[in-house]
């Protein structure tokens, strides 16, 4: 941003009151006392340097000694007009070392009134350019501009090693009535640790806070922010970004590998892979396995590993656990060059109570609601954002914008949307407050989500948004101009719950629960659904996918193969959590890598091979993905064979090509099974989950399958096939 015109020298307010407030670290307007001031006969320069024994001021006549007017470290000089900005020569009291530096109070503020206005209105979508820290030039001098929002503060200071963490030394300038504080500190190198010391105006409480807009933090358990280093990363993903802008994602295959960076793989000593190492190892694996995207569990900075990243303290920073921001850029860039999209799990629903971060940031409920019935999440022990506060809206929208813009992220998965939409979410009667109409809908959250999706789709062509929404809220993935929330897709939690419940049943009981396989088609096209088998289903005693399956060991693996066949052929885009693809035996453990040694065993290698083949079949076959969101892409052949627990359906592409899917959910091989077909021609089996390659019994249908000439199940013809046990087959 361009500097504002330098203000005229202020009237000297060097009374006892201002001096006392400075020394007590309570001075609200440091520019009224420090810096240059007009006095009779010229100008006065006043600095506060409590750790210096002597101070000189550079004038047109050279360096002049400044008079120490208070033994706490106040130095003054009076004379004719001083050239701005002016340089100070400082002698350290402890060491005698002499250094030269510019006075922060010799520089004008830089943030424009227009940006402050937009921020206060909730319409500043790139607030990260204004707030936080930035390496800038001010009056030709390079330095760091600090800016933070703390409207209920009496005083805000930048503190760090460079000023002995002394809140008296670098108090910030209050920017009118915006609640924003700003200070330019010259010659501060990138990578310098800092925090904000905030004194509440009403209570006098002093808080030490990290920067909400910082782009980098020190490694946990420490939590100071770091001043930025100029990024020199040169992106090489232009082809991907151009292609994405014209991407017809509604009709394209979307097959997502959900991954936690810290527990996918680790070094033998248990240390994390860096972002660069992850790129080098993960990308070839994703390509081999046939995934179109990788979705990262939250990599925004967070203090607690066991939160999986869902208790965020740094909404603009890639966690330093795995490297610096440029290293994460490298990861995204390499994914794009390999044709892999990158989706981030993003958490605008709540934030942790950690005292160093957003919670009661300036001594008041700033980012959260004051009333715990609105502002406290009982299940997670976290605070809920106040979406009705304009500056909070600017903060969250800017966070989303930052990841999509600066890091070229291809999509955001918004966590816990249901908890945002309902004021009574997980609350008993009397524990929540209704909206202004007396209802339980969070109107502010609804507006925020619509603005979020409007921004993403309007400014980042081809970028996607995913809602993890577990209720029947209507039109989650419908455009905002039609009254929807505007998400690209919604997680189909109903399909996931029904399917996993069904797969855990003993096959002898499954025919009583046949509707759990068929009910999904009654609502499958009310939203743009994605079918998840996610991290939430393999933790907290829920068991791994393999352990959920019923039967003996052979049947458990057969059931898992059948589950993946059903998922990959059912309408909807796909997402699978890491480890699912090779039948991880244990629940996911965040502090350990996956059990890769299982791939030494044939059944696990078989699952991996099956899912690899299914993934590539899905990517390469228009009938399995082009019409995922449209009724024309799916039709039942027979959904009524509950007695034998068999379902059959066809998937179609826009050009009319189709595939037939027949699934047998019992361990009984069925010979002579008649299936209706839409065309009187020969068919071939192109996939069989019971293949010996996958660990099955190799029962199937080799060669041509000839129609019988008999109509069946409302189809023009039929075929006679053999159905393998606990398996699915695909015919073309």
Curated annotation (Swiss-Prot):
The keyword Glycoprotein appears for this protein: no
Catalytic activity: Transfers a segment of a (1->4)-alpha-D-glucan chain to a primary hydroxy group in a similar glucan chain
Pathway(s) this gene product operates in, as recorded in its UniProt entry: Glycan biosynthesis; glycogen biosynthesis
One of the GO BP terms on file: glycogen biosynthetic process
The entry's keywords: Carbohydrate metabolism, Glycogen biosynthesis, Glycogen metabolism, Glycosyltransferase, Transferase
Gene Ontology MF terms: 1,4-alpha-glucan branching enzyme activity; cation binding; hydrolase activity, hydrolyzing O-glycosyl compounds
NCBIfam families: branching_enzym, PRK05402.1, PRK12313.1
Family: Belongs to the glycosyl hydrolase 13 family. GlgB subfamily.
Protein name: 1,4-alpha-glucan branching enzyme GlgB
Organism: Nitrosomonas eutropha (strain DSM 101675 / C91 / Nm57)
